[in-house]
Amino acid sequence: MKYDHQSIETRWQKKWEDSGIFQCDTEADKPKYYVLEMFPYPSGNIHMGHVRNYSIGDVVARFKRMQGFNVLHPMGWDAFGLPAENAAIKNGTHPAKWTFANIDNMRSQLKRLGYSYDWQREVATCTPEYYRWEQLFFLRFLEKGLVYRKKAAQNWCPKCHTVLANEQVIEGLCWRCDSAVEQKELTQWFLRITDYAEELLADLSKLENGWPERVLSMQRNWIGKSTGAEIRFALDGRDDSITVFTTRPDTIFGATFMSIAPEHPLVEELIDGKPQADDVRAFVERIRNMDRIDRQSDTLEKEGVFTGAYCVNPFTGRKMPIWVANFVLAEYGTGAVMAVPAHDQRDFEFARKYDLPMQVVIQPQGEALDPATMSAAWTEAGALVNSGAFDGLANEDAKQRIADDLETTGNGRRTINYRLRDWNISRQRYWGAPIPVIYCDACGVVPEKEENLPVVLPLDVKTHDDGRSPLPHTPAFYECTCPVCGGKARRETDTMDTFVESSWYFARYTDATNDKAPFTPDALRYWLPVDQYIGGVEHAILHLLYSRFFTKALRDCGFIELDEPFANLLTQGMVLMDGSKMSKSKGNVVDPTEMIARYGADTVRLFCLFAAPPERDFDWSESGIEGSYRFVGRVWRLVEELREHLLAVGACSSTAEDAKTPVARELRLKEHATVRKAGDDLNDRFQFNTAIAAVMELVNALYLAKDELVADESGRKVLSSAVSTVLTLLSPFTPHLSEELWALLGHTESVSTLPWPRWKEDALVRDTVTLVVQVNGKLRGKLDIPADASREEVETLALNEPNVLRYLEGVTVRKVVVIPGKLVNVVVS
């Protein structure tokens, strides 16, 4: 009988769906395991990256079920956002119609791969049933002071017609469309993620045993904690001051000028009435539209313009010119930097370019730095010089002494600064969750009443070809009544950043059909945190950081009782073609649907899991998938050939008594060694490729042993046990193949419900071992001896082995070297 993967796979997929075998409920008396892959944007078709990601998750889910866990393995759709809106506009259709058609198609594709999802828990973030709870969270955050509105310069994508969070700007370009990002003054809604900066940083230590260090490091760097001091510099000729943040208060005596950001609020005041005002304004306008990341680059050419204003160094009394510089950012620290060119490389380059003074205040041991001959700033440790009463102090000690002085005199204070900035969630696009806020001329900004949720995104709108939102031009949406005074009012027409939806979806899965609440405390307590989260490392900062923040904010609003959403994280590698990322523009895309039609879902899954460890990239290869296809066929033919013999003995687990011959004993040993190896590789290490390799070796052993073992009943029992083990071990990887062959062997229960096999210690002990016998290091014979033979018995048997005896004639045996379990070397002369 030919292996017809198409009919076999679709038949088993229907059986699984009809039986609800993968549905789960909260069972307080059973250990839980929550495995989750990052849900996809419904683009219309899955790609090979999806296949790899979801195949990894499915193996984990199936393996954990076999270990006795109550497994939650859900799937849904990250369905709002720019891609869907832009694609719908391009194709002349409505984003909702486009999105739901894509969801239907991708759901069918995922089902065709045989993933063991609980489809009852499916969510789509673009439905009112989902985003009503997100709007509730917004109102509770607003009530708690975690949401605020302000006007500020924002990252603006002219092509997408919306603002971008700092994390969504990659090297000055929009993360979605690669357009150059501009700066635009807008009033926006923000979430106070900075309120959680320290906790987000500190709690990374809780994840050290479960998350990749690379991701932890990326989050630490993005949060960017700096310990230092704020110092006030009086403005010359004015009753005002300008404050800087510095991590190097020990260098205060070397500050010779000040650099401020083009966006600094004092720029206009400082240049008012100055002859260079127009030059400064032109410089500010040019630099403000530069990418913030580029402005921090070490290779950036340092540029600036003198404001004509001065400040006064509080320690030296020296007047310091104030410059606007391109490398100073308004959002870092205070937007002003005390420039110490002798001890900061950026300041050094700037001072050299504009001929500004330098003052050495830290000398390395045994050297005397001279500003006139320095080729770079001295940024290492040393002793203070030219620093008044602090001369001679080690610079680390001086940091504390000078900070003490600042706090005593009132000129400054110790402080901590973070690179992290509050999360701008306002988007000027249509396809997103409406922000539940109303503007009333009489009452101001008014939150929508909770009982009026959801604020439904209207579907009866006409989208604009250029991407502008239709909501500000849809009176039926924005015209409303003020919840406070009952007067005429206007709804907010911005929608929420789609990363808001993905920041809490993992919690909704625990109670996805609840229409009275986003989730219940019992469901959350039982299922959370997610035991194993799986997704790409590209989400390290955006999605993963936002989800961690959202969990803590929901906790503080009384919704959740935990601190971290994901206990363990696996970041899978990419599927490449000829070393490059697959993309339509490169013409190197492999279509999963085509591969499934040609080879079957099991083969596609198997290849994606066998090609490389899950965290590493791998190259797609025709020879590789052909090899996986041959293996699937090999297993099919093995069981088909042995079927009648195996049906005769029935299902059994062979015993030591059944393994009467060396071949039987070796196969039984191989079976149990494979169970141990595969279990170790899957149990939290997730080394799928080596687990599969071990099963392949067992299949090879079966082929070598089958002809001898079918001859008697005890041998057939050993065969039956080993074949059953192969099908059980393969079931997480190739579930359709395993189900079909299991049924062909007369079993009525699903292989998916079987427990993971257990290996027996006694089966791993060999009764005999094979030793190589050498004479003067050259192979002359082999010995099969009892495993517990003594050294003396081994020597005697080796010296009397017939082939060896021929090489001992006429020579003198000087020494016999025995390496237990491996070889005997007879030294002669």
Curated annotation (Swiss-Prot):
Tell me the keywords, alphabetical order.
Aminoacyl-tRNA synthetase, ATP-binding, Cytoplasm, Ligase, Nucleotide-binding, Protein biosynthesis
What general EC class does the enzyme of this chain belong to?
A: ligase
Q: Which residues bind ATP?
A: K584
InterPro entries, per the entry: aa-tRNA-synth_I_CS (IPR001412), aa-tRNA-synth_Ia (IPR002300), Leu-tRNA-ligase (IPR002302), Leu_tRNA-synth_edit (IPR025709), M/V/L/I-tRNA-synth_anticd-bd (IPR013155), Methionyl/Leucyl_tRNA_Synth (IPR015413), Rossmann-like_a/b/a_fold (IPR014729), tRNAsynth_Ia_anticodon-bd (IPR009080)
Subcellular location field: Cytoplasm
Q: Where is this motif: 'KMSKS' region?
A: 581-585
* Keyword flag Protein biosynthesis: yes
The enzyme's E.C. designation: 6.1.1.4
- Residue ranges spanning the membrane: these are none
Q: What is one GO cellular-component annotation here?
A: cytosol
Note one Pfam family from the annotation.
tRNA-synt_1
Motif ('HIGH' region) positions are: 40-50
- Cite a single GO MF annotation: aminoacyl-tRNA deacylase activity
Highest taxon listed in the record's lineage: Bacteria
Q: Which GO terms describe its biological process?
A: leucyl-tRNA aminoacylation
Catalytically driven reaction(s): tRNA(Leu) + L-leucine + ATP = L-leucyl-tRNA(Leu) + AMP + diphosphate
The record's comment on protein family reads: Belongs to the class-I aminoacyl-tRNA synthetase family.
Q: What is this protein called?
A: Leucine--tRNA ligase
